Amino acid sequence: MKMKLTLDGIKDKKSWEAAGVVLPSYDIEKVKEETKKSPAWVHFGIGNIFRIFIGGIADTLISNGAMDKGITCVETFDFDVVDKIYAPYDNLVLGVTLKADGSTDKKVIASLTEAIKAQSNVEAEWNRLKEIFQNKDRAR
């Protein structure tokens, strides 16, 4: 069984469940679309702790129906994070939590809906960032 951490890859639910990985219970594409249209949560600095901790909190809130939008992720320093960690995996995260008894909880976190480089010399990235903060429909 070959599993891929991508939006297409997680459609093979049986393989992921057999591996003990919990998949998002919500419509990922709908959350991505709503977030892109009207961003509500923008986070600067998108490293490991952010992905599992803050991303995990947002994922739980979306799963519970307390939020209908994900997080717009902005990297200000190490742009390879976007290119090598976010983009190849469709912004999905495999969260593994080690518990005190040595067991693990594994889940796919899909709340990180867009990853942007705060790179002013790359017109598309910079324009998207400006668009987010100029969006009058953006939740306040």
Predicted regions and their residues:
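Non-transmembrane, aqueous-exposed alpha-helical and coiled segments at domain scale
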Residues: 1-140
